[in-house]
Amino acid sequence: MTDTVSGTSGTSGAPGASDPSDAPGAVRPPADPGAGGFTEALAEATAVASLAPSSHNCQPWALARLTGERARAAARLFAGTGNRTGPAGDGTETLALAMDRTRTIGALAAHDVEMRVSCGAYWQLLLSALAAQGWHPEGIEYPATDGEGRRLAGDRWPKSWSLLGVARVRRTGDGDGSLRRLRETAAARRTNRGPYGASGIGTDVLAELTGPSAGAAAGAPVAVTHLRGETERRAFGNFVARHGGRDFSHDAAWRETFAYLRPNASAAALRGDGFTLEQLFGPMSAARHHLLRTALAPRTMRVLRFAGYPGLLASQLAAIVRRTPAVTVMHFLADEPSGADMVRAGARLADYWLRATHAGLALHPVSVVVQHDDVRAALAERFGLRGRVFFVARLGHPTAQFPATPRHREAAAHLRL
């Protein structure tokens, strides 16, 4: 049984609604309590948004608060672009979303899409947390190209930042009391790679996950397909068995992935990004940890691939996939989505993941099937998916807890311009 739901707009059912640190003007929570209203609300919102998911836990987002002439420049820049999703207005605060290329991955062409999707997830959490405090978007706009940041802030715009979007928010009242729930749900969200329970997921629950969204996710040009039937899940498992070893046999991609694999939790916390073997495979003995880390090292992998090791890892992943009660597939409505589409898709993904977390469900992305062009095309053809696929994950009730991933100290920062 396959269920597909296309993107819609409306009121969100998601919880809560919906390296600039050394640069002059960098701001981090907690906010100055004497600064008043929006500064405090923004500090709360960035703390929540910093918990957004990202590929390799690289946290590629960046945020600027535009003031004075720079805020007016933003209004002029996007006037008449056709990328507007709301009216302009006075008395608003202006925020600029950017991608910091010093914290992105890029070994594969598809990684650029993943980075924009990751930034979109952050954007949605940020706007949802602001809305929960009474600050609602009056307009969200997206530039036609990445190079518009300097038109907003001139030389003050960081060279490594690519502008992805601008939002104007206005306080329309007090918070609705949902901030705490949003914060707790965002903190509870995990990538859980362990086994899931055998019990199915009801159609009513899936309908909740794919319900209308607000904020940056409103009307996102995205469809969600759930592979639920035994035949479909077995077919997807077979697909993973056939293609799941690609990352391990791709030198550049695997070197980049391994570079984010931290030796232990302390090292991960110190770096503030990446992941540990325990976050990939669950708890393990010191001996198994050493063996796995040695086997996964790029130099070792180049030898082991001739012995079929990537295929063995793919078959192990496929076995877990076949026992999963549902597989979530998110795909654009277009074959060639725009940069704005990618950011909005990330916002939609954030809503979906938070709703799943609130429902007691877990997600485990199976990214290898979307990161290589030929594999992604074969996936779409095999399962009749229209538009470019950008996210595939196991969905189910977790049977084991996985630790949270660390956060970079700049993940909750913003730059005031």
Language model features by range: what are they?
Residues M1-S12, S18-L417:
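Acidic, surface-exposed loops and disordered segments
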